[in-house]
């Protein structure tokens, strides 16, 4: 199946064999079995084959065969929800850790076993457009209109990452844009913008 998030039309699910679509959408009065909203920004299939959806202003949605559950924003100091209700990006680092990039609330870490969130104040106000694994203990995060950064969850530190050179970095990141990140092999990370750049983790070169 191919899952497609739409802006207002819920989630369309394509069966490639039959070429037919099925639909997940918001149905008033059926909160446990329908989406909380129909505008979906990102989708992520985790290692347990559960689907996660990031919505516009309606939080993080856990989609399972028998039910759905939504996690929304909470006040600072509360670990039972998001730092911002709009979810731009998702990435699973391990079975008990899902990274959530929000639209202005920075990056959140979510443990699906305990259902607890960790917020990182150093990323507050950041719009986290994409997340991927960089090296053990560190992530690459793409911030809207700011660039790509190496993020250390242990310290909360963000270190700017240069894509090829300063000129290329500025063209890709600093004009109302964001780069999408994909670690497509153990050694390579794809930087997806106007062009595709391949970063080799072994040689640390593009």
Can you annotate each of these PLM segments?
Residues 1-206:
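Carboxylate-rich, polar loop motifs that coordinate divalent cations or form catalytic acidic clusters
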């Amino acid at each position: 199946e191919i899952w497609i998030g739409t802006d207002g039309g819920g989630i369309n699910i394509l069966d490639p064999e039959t070429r037919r679509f099925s639909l997940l959408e918001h149905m008033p009065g059926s909160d446990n079995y329908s989406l909380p909203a129909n505008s979906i920004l990102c989708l992520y299939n985790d290692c347990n084959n559960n689907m996660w959806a990031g919505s516009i202003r309606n939080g993080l949605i856990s989609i399972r065969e028998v039910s759905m559950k939504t996690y929304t924003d909470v006040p600072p100091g509360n670990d039972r929800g998001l730092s911002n209700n709009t979810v731009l990006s998702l990435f699973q680092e391990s079975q008990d850790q899902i990274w959530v990039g929000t639209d202005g609330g920075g990056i959140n870490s979510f443990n699906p076993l305990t259902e607890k969130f960790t917020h990182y104040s150093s990323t507050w106000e950041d719009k986290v457009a994409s997340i991927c694994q960089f090296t053990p203990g560190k992530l690459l995060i793409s911030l809207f209109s700011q660039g790509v950064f190496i993020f250390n969850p242990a310290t909360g530190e963000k270190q700017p990452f240069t894509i090829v050179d300063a000129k290329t970095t500025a063209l890709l990141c600093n004009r109302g844009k964001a780069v999408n990140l994909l670690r497509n092999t153990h050694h390579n990370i794809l930087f997806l913008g106007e062009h595709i750049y391949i970063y080799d983790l072994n040689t640390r070169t593009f």
